[in-house]
Amino acid sequence: MIENDALHPMPSPGTLRDQRGVVFVEFLIAFLPVYTFFLCLIQLALLFVVRLVTEHTAMNAARAAAVVIGDDPKRYGGERINRLTVRGSVRYDAVRDAALLSMAPLILNGFVHDVKIVFPSEERPGGPARTGALTFAPMNDSRVSKVRVRVEVEAECRIGIANRIVCPLSFGFTHATDALRMAVPMHPVRAEAVYPYQGARYDYP
């Protein structure tokens, strides 16, 4: 009996107490991946909401441009019809205001930043942004003119842990607010819409 006790010593009470943490460690091992996956789902859902609102904003901006470009010059500081100067005209500001109103809920709660309204070529989806004075020919019996508008925003990734996984960090500092990306990652979201341009005139009382 003495030899058996020497070969198989009884565990001390302290050793039994040390083994009680095994269940907690196993819980952490199983819980953390599931919890991280849940956070990533929330972050992806928020980005999907931003995507939907951006698409809606692009459509509203295209519809506004189709009306504003051919509208009465008296309402836009005497600017010529069928013409729009990017970032330098009252007509462009009116189109941008329509986009900002559509994006207002996400702007007010800080989900999106740096809203940009660009006008690529009507025949080039995803094309580069055009600058300067743009001219648009009203549609006729042989040609359907179109206005293409793209809305570009930076979506803020707020969900902890998941924002580092879903939204990659950017180390390019080209803007004064780019340093915030180190603390709060951003994800670019873009959406385009195209709308026929009739060049219709409107009568006002």
For every predicted segment, state its role:
Residues E26-F27, L39, V49, V153-E156, ...:
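Broad hydrophobic/π-residue packing in well-ordered secondary structure
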Residues L7-L32:
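Glycine-centered recognition micro-motifs in short, flexible terminal segments and loops
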Residues L44, T57-P73:
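N-terminal alpha-helical signal peptides/signal-anchor transmembrane segments
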Residues M1-P9, V67-P205:
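Short, conserved structural patches
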Residues E26, T36-L39, A133, H175:
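Generic, low-specificity signal for short hydrophobic/alpha-helical stretches with a mild N-terminal bias
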